[in-house]
Design a protein with these regions (language model features):
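Scaffold/interface architecture of coatomer-like assemblies
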Residues: 20-328
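Bacterial N-terminal signal peptides
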Residues: 7-17
Length: 328
């Protein structure tokens, strides 16, 4: 009966995922509100978690903004765990599952977690719940092969998070970073270039799907933490051609841009043994973030970049968050 329950759970999870993932509804958020997840450290890099609303000053394009909502670092998160189950990860799946399960143990009791696997498909294995045992069971069921549908998975995660209303939001994505569709598009660009120009021919922002997920992350104030597997590291390729190096390098730069634009951090996994430690670092970082919202004094939706700066006046503390957004 135990195995029957497991297989029934797997069937229901994947069946519902195929239905949900097939939807292409736009994310609807009150885009006039800017949400920032903010980490604060001292000069030695130690997290500061005892600040309140009056400790912060927010500037947009140099103009001070009025904080409309503030949540302390103890407020719960809604987190999507994205697990790369493409063919390139097959040889170390046990490491992935063990490390991901330990990440759950490091979260706060009220944090809600959803688990999503991606490869050629994107499957919701378990929806948001504070029941970490359910999430752990879902991680064990993760399996797949084939291509890497990374950007579709991130977009799907953002769509799920849009239903989490006013909760603090984050995505933790374990991947080599090489999205198959974007790589194929990059290859087409490079096909007309001589090898001497390939290293500088690609731009991270050249992918439409990539740019859309950045915009949607902006709208919700979602912080994204990529955990980059060594199989996607261009420096680890064995005697790569200029084309191969350019493709992998652009994929890794996109992961870095995702982290930078959303206020997260890119954690490169150099050895598989480090995976659990880096998951723990991400969990610890989530527990130190404040969430701040403001209604911009510039109410134009002109698509222009707005630079955001966060200060903790009268101190030498350092605040980290996303550096801005496009006003759409």
């Amino acid at each position: 009966m135990h195995y029957l329950r497991i297989y029934f759970f797997l069937f229901i999870s994947i069946a519902s995922a195929l239905t949900i993932a097939g939807q292409d509804d736009p994310i609807k958020i009150d885009s006039s509100i800017v949400r920032l997840n903010v980490g604060v450290v001292d000069q030695r890099g130690r997290p500061i978690t005892s600040l309140d609303r009056t400790s912060f000053a927010i500037y947009e394009d140099g103009i001070k903004q009025e904080i409309s909502r503030f949540e302390a670092s103890t407020a719960p998160f809604s987190v999507v765990m994205l697990l790369d189950m493409s063919g390139s990860t097959k040889s170390f799946r046990p490491n992935i599952k063990l490390s991901a399960a330990r990440f759950l143990d490091a979260l706060a009791p009220d944090d809600r977690v959803a688990v999503v696997e991606f490869y050629s498909k994107v499957n919701l294995l378990s929806d948001f719940s504070a029941d970490k045992r359910l999430a752990a069971q879902s991680i064990e069921l993760a399996n797949g092969q084939g291509e890497t549908n990374l950007y579709k998975a991130l977009q799907f995660a953002l769509e799920r998070l849009s239903n989490e209303r006013t909760r603090r939001k984050a995505i933790v994505v374990l991947t080599d970073g090489v999205d198959t569709n974007a790589r194929n598009d990059d290859r087409k660009i490079l096909s007309s270039k001589p090898e001497s120009e390939m290293a500088t021919a690609l731009k991270a922002e050249s992918s439409g799907a990539f740019n859309k997920l950045l915009r949607d992350a902006d709208l919700q104030g979602v912080t994204i933490y990529p955990l980059a597997l060594p199989t996607g590291d261009p420096k680890r390729l064995a005697d790569p051609t200029p084309l191969q190096f350019a493709l992998y390098d652009n994929s890794r730069r996109r992961l870095q841009l995702i982290a930078d634009r959303t206020g997260g951090r890119l954690n490169a996994i150099n050895r598989l043994e480090e995976m659990g430690k880096l998951y723990a670092i991400v969990a610890a970082d989530l527990r130190t973030l404040y969430t701040i919202e403001y209604d911009p004094s510039n109410d134009k939706h002109d698509g222009q970049w707005r630079t955001v700066k966060i200060e903790v006046p009268g101190t030498e503390l350092i605040a980290r968050s996303r550096q801005g957004y496009f006003a759409r």
